[in-house]
Amino acid sequence: MKKPLSLLALVLAAACAHAAEVKLVEQADKKQVDVLVDGQPFTSYVFWADQKKPLLSPLRTASGNIFTRGFPLEKVAGERTDHPHHISSWFNYGNVNGTDFWNSPPEGYSRDSKMPYGNIKHKAILAMKSGEGVASLKVSSDWILADGSKVLQQDETLVFRAAK
């Protein structure tokens, strides 16, 4: 009788354990997709019109504390105002065919690069899937050189997993 009860306890424990729901919510008017974990904000994939590149902002810990800085998107008392191209979290490179995609600061900030700046323009949300413990967002972006020509198309899948 001891073994069946132990097995039953294990099965019940596994059935009661549940992974957090990871939900993607598109806000077309704001040009962003919010990532929620059990209904609480984790981050947003943002692709605002005046942005030089799509990014994740802000990033939060599991307890909800924001750990990315606000500058240059917003002013936060006591926060440093250097490196205006360090806008939350993003993926790109510093030199693609002689164009700098890394150091592209927002309009009005000084240029640090001797190379021309490129832009990464969000084109489309290709797929969104929310679920228990994991969500995925597939997007497409064009990398645009300073002369306006497209150097590459980037299709990427961002995967968000909830801690167990």
Question: How would you name each of these model-derived features?
Answer:
Residues 1-8:
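Bacterial N-terminal signal peptides that target proteins for export
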Residues 3, 15, 59-60, 66-68, ...:
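Short, intrinsically disordered/low-complexity patches at protein termini
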Residues 9-19:
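Hydrophobic h-region of N-terminal signal peptides that target proteins for export
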Residues 18-30, 41-42, 116-127, 155:
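Short small/polar-residue motifs
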Residues 20-84:
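Beta-strand-rich N-terminal accessory domains
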Residues 82-163:
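Extended, loop-rich substrate-binding clefts of extracytoplasmic carbohydrate-active enzymes
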